[in-house]
UniProtKB/Swiss-Prot annotation:
This is Tyrosinase. InterPro entries: Di-copper_centre_dom_sf, Tyrosinase/Hemocyanin, Tyrosinase_Cu-bd. The gene is melC2. One of its GO terms (molecular function) is metal ion binding. NCBIfam families: TyrosinaseMelC2 (NF047834). Signal peptide: none annotated. Cu cation B binds at residues 189, 193, 215. It comes from Streptomyces lincolnensis. Belongs to the tyrosinase family. Cu cation A binds at residues 37, 53, 62.
């Protein structure tokens, strides 16, 4: 059984294996993940179904997305699991995940270019090919947006919200999903993307490997919320236009519904509850 661990507790060998597996993914295969994520960035006013963001399926869609990536890593090294980044505890640019032997640190002040760690441009092994501008290197500006990372108290305030989601099922909704996603309230998920900066603050955010650690923690928070509340684990149940209902399969895979992904324990567990 795959066990997802807090990145702060990883051994040097576990870090090395994770980095090696990410770097061993073919560029074309990795770019598919980046492209898929970017294609599912939508606004409330866009026509058609909202699936990956600004909708109830934000959490099961990303759970399915992370499973796909984790399996890709395990095809390289079966011992690898996605670690998670608890940004409510590891809250600074000096935290262990930003070390040169893991993800590397922040970027240059003038252009955001990351200059240390295994994903820096100088290695020549991490070119950014799915991009929104001409820059072909990994960029970050840790903390540069001014607002600090979410606190544990802010996380707890969101976990206390009893209702998973509600109409209008978008970024105006006042439920757990939308507060966790960050369009309402204290702003958890979105705020972390902006804090990291660079590609993480855009639709091509999986270009930065920290994307996976961030979303593994978002997934863990969803699991914690599920254990805490007896209310329906996912809504809407059926018959809702422009969003994914409980038993409706999700694009682009068409093989999993939110109902299929409510219980993660058949795929992986976490090191702590």
């Amino acid at each position: 059984m795959t066990v997802r661990k807090n990145q702060a507790t990883l051994t040097a060998d576990e870090k090395r294996r994770f980095v090696t597996a990410v770097l061993s993914s073919s560029a074309a295969r990795y770019d598919t993940f980046v492209t898929t994520h970017n294609e599912f960035i939508v606004a409330d006013t866009d026509n058609g179904e909202r699936t990956g963001h600004r909708s109830p399926s934000f959490l099961p869609w990303h759970r399915r997305f992370l499973l796909e990536f984790e399996r890709a890593l395990q095809s390289v090294d079966a011992s690898v699991a996605l670690p998670y980044w608890d940004w409510s505890t590891d809250r600074s640019a000096r935290s262990s995940l930003w070390a040169p032997d893991f993800l590397g640190g922040t970027g240059r002040s003038r252009n955001g270019r990351v200059t240390d760690g295994p994903f820096r441009a100088a290695t020549g092994v991490w070119p950014i090919t799915v991009r929104l501008d001409g820059r072909t290197y990994l960029r970050r500006a840790l903390g540069g947006a001014g607002r600090e990372l979410p606190t544990r108290a802010e996380v707890d305030s969101v976990l206390s919200i009893p209702t998973y989601d509600m109409a209008p099922w978008n970024s105006a909704s006042d439920g757990f999903r939308n507060h966790l996603e960050g369009w309402r309230g204290v702003n958890l998920h979105n705020r972390v993307h902006v804090w990291v900066g660079g590609q993480m603050a855009t639709g091509v955010s999986p270009n930065d490997p920290v994307f996976w650690l961030h979303h593994a923690y978002i997934d863990k928070l969803w699991a914690q919320w599920q254990r805490r509340h007896r209310t329906p684990a996912y809504v809407p149940a059926a018959g809702t236009p422009d969003v994914v209902d409980l038993d409706e399969t999700m694009k682009p895979w068409h093989d999993s519904s939110p109902a299929d992904l409510l219980d993660h324990t058949g795929h992986y567990t976490f090191d702590t509850d």
